């Protein structure tokens, strides 16, 4: 039925308040959503105290249910409060075990039991079969969660990453929950102009007291679906009309199956090692399969690297860490040789990607965005009161679309090799380690911040070893005397200043990862708006 109230008068001109600047919108356009930017003013010479900084950090994509949502627990009822709501599949799914169901996009289900959280017992109305289905692959029939364009809890920066992915035309759009206003939504649209090139505009969708929705009060709608239909037919004040929903990509599963959710020590025979991806000091990394049908990464540890008992204890904590910028731990084989089974990232380590892969051609905006993703994952680790202890580009993995995820968090504490535990031994990563951690074993989230500063140098130098020309002993001595790496070639001074603040001698003076995430996400609007690509960066 369309527009509840839709006046044909010109849309009121609103100022576009975006990324700290005010620009008058042209023509008949609405102003884009003035999402507040959570950074202090950043000058070249002085940086404020970061540690009291609070930002609304963006979370990963949770379409419906899954680990970031509590909306799918308990009894499932229809709007009238009786009976059972039907759910519809948003994606195809291939069964991994005899307990779960294969299904196709569009298939409808009756939910029999939703108490397992991420896995629901369901009956397919197409086949009549009963089994478990991943809860984030389905949504209630006719709900906004079932719409192609609805992305749920997706942060502003992640919305921009998805919309700016290669191949999306101007007018690609999505709707997500507002980060700043409870009950409201944001419409994010890919746009293009001569000045900015490809970019994303965000519009706040506000809710009326009677349940309707509007971007401007001149055009009000009973449902979000009607709003989308209206702006798909005409721009009507937006930057352009809505052309096509953004591609969602498959949701991430945090378990291999419903059985491994709680019992995730698995038999070695269920794993097949297919292709060796890397060989390190303490073991190898393989691409393989679980159960013959699910692609995984398998880290095999040399016997004696760590105590199986200590590893299993730490793995209990690691399994509970769930964030879209952390490599998900799926399962373990806890008898030696220990196997660690995680999600597979097809581009390998960030270090190899920068030195020998596609990363060699990347310019500063991509590199800063990758750093922002790492900071987002570390901000989650910070919130969870956990510590990584070995943050460097070799322990960051890369996937399609320059997606970065943190791997091997927490494992360094368990290593029993004397060449490592001595901290000045040959296998210990001195060049990435904060002095208080290297000298006195004081590992904290603030020593991780130091390591992040070193990782920033790896990014802008495309994988160069830190402190070139210096050995570990020299690095330790020089850093204790106050030496810090100079600004790398072509690196903006403002980014080097951020590194220097990560390398403050007093750990408490170093920034939080929450601040680092926000600063890097808004770097090219708040700090370096005049950036022009150079030969290297």
Swiss-Prot record:
Tissue expression from the record: Isoform 1 is highly expressed in the brain. Isoform 2 is expressed in cells of hemopoietic lineages, especially T-lymphocytes.
All copies of domain SH2, residue ranges: 149-246
Pfam families: PK_Tyr_Ser-Thr (PF07714), SH2 (PF00017), SH3_1 (PF00018)
Regions that span the bilayer: none
Enzyme class of the recorded protein, top EC level: transferase
Stated regulation of activity: Inhibited by phosphorylation of Tyr-531 by leukocyte common antigen and activated by dephosphorylation of this site.
Catalytic activity, EC: 2.7.10.2
Keyword Disulfide bond set for record: no
Residues involved in ATP binding: 277-285, 299
Active-site residues (renumbered): 390 (proton acceptor)
Boundaries of every Protein kinase domain copy: 271-524
UniProt region (Disordered), positions on chain: 14-35
Family: Belongs to the protein kinase superfamily. Tyr protein kinase family. SRC subfamily.
Residue positions where Phosphotyrosine is found in the record: 185, 420, 531
Residue numbers with lipid attached (N-myristoyl glycine): 2
Protein name, as recorded: Tyrosine-protein kinase Fyn
Keywords: Adaptive immunity, ATP-binding, Cell membrane, Cytoplasm, Developmental protein, Host-virus interaction, Immunity, Kinase, Lipoprotein, Manganese, Membrane, Metal-binding, Myristate, Nucleotide-binding, Nucleus, Palmitate, Phosphoprotein, Proto-oncogene, SH2 domain, SH3 domain, Transferase, Tyrosine-protein kinase
Keyword Cytoplasm recorded: yes
Gene Ontology biological process terms, A to Z: activated T cell proliferation; adaptive immune response; axon guidance; calcium ion transport; cell differentiation; cell surface receptor protein tyrosine kinase signaling pathway; cellular response to amyloid-beta; cellular response to glycine
Origin: domain of life: Eukaryota
Lipid moiety-binding region (S-palmitoyl cysteine): 3, 6
Modified residues annotated as Phosphoserine in this record: 21, 26
């Amino acid at each position: 039925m369309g527009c509840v109230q839709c006046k044909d008068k010109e849309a009121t001109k609103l100022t576009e308040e975006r990324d700290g600047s005010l620009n008058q919108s042209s023509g008949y356009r609405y102003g884009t959503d003035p999402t507040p930017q959570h950074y202090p003013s950043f000058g070249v010479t002085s940086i404020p105290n970061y540690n009291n900084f609070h930002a609304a950090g963006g979370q990963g994509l949770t379409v419906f249910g899954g680990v970031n949502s509590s909306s799918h627990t308990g009894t499932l009822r229809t709007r009238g409060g009786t009976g059972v709501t039907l759910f519809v599949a948003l994606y195809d799914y291939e069964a991994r075990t005899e307990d779960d169901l294969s299904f196709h996009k569009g298939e409808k289900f009756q939910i029999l039991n939703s108490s397992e959280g991420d896995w629901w017992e369901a009956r397919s109305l197409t086949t009549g079969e009963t089994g478990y289905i991943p809860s984030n692959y389905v949504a209630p029939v006719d709900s906004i969660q079932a719409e192609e364009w609805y992305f749920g809890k997706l942060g502003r920066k992640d919305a921009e990453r998805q919309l700016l992915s290669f191949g999306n035309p101007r007018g690609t759009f999505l709707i997500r929950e507002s980060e700043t206003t409870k009950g409201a939504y944001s419409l994010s649209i890919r746009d293009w102009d001569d000045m900015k090139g490809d970019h994303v505009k965000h519009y706040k969708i506000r809710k009326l007291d009677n349940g309707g929705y509007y971007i401007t009060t001149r055009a009000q709608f009973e449902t979000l679906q009607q709003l989308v239909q209206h702006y798909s037919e005409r721009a009507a004040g937006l930057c352009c009309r809505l052309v096509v929903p953004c591609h969602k990509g498959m949701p991430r599963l945090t378990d291999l199956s419903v059985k491994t959710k709680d019992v995730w020590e698995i038999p070695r025979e269920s794993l097949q090692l297919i292709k060796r991806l890397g060989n390190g000091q303490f073991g190898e990394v393989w691409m393989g399969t679980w159960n013959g049908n699910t692609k995984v990464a398998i880290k095999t540890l040399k016997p004696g690297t760590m105590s199986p008992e200590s590893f299993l204890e730490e793995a209990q904590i690691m399994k509970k860490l769930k964030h879209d910028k952390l490599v998900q731990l799926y399962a373990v084989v806890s008898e030696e040789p220990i196997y660690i089974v995680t999600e597979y990232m097809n581009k390998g380590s960030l270090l190899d990607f920068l030195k020998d892969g596609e990363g060699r051609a990347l310019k500063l905006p991509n590199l800063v965005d990758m750093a922002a993703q790492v900071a987002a994952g570390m901000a989650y680790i910070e919130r969870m009161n956990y510590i990584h202890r070995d943050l460097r580009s070799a322990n960051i993995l890369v996937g399609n679309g320059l997606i970065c995820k943190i791997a091997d968090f927490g494992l360094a504490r368990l290593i029993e090799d004397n060449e490592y535990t001595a901290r000045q031994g040959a296998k210990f990563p001195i060049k990435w380690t904060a002095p208080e951690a290297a000298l006195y074993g004081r590992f904290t989230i603030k020593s991780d911040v130091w390591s992040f500063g070193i990782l920033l140098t790896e990014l802008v130098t495309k994988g160069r070893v830190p402190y070139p020309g210096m050995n570990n002993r020299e690095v330790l001595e020089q850093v204790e005397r106050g030496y810090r790496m100079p600004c790398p070639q072509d690196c903006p001074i403002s980014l080097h200043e951020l590194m220097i603040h990560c390398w403050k001698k007093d750990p408490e003076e170093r920034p939080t990862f929450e601040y680092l995430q926000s600063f890097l996400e808004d770097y090219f609007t708040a700090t370096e708006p005049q950036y022009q690509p150079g030969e290297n960066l």
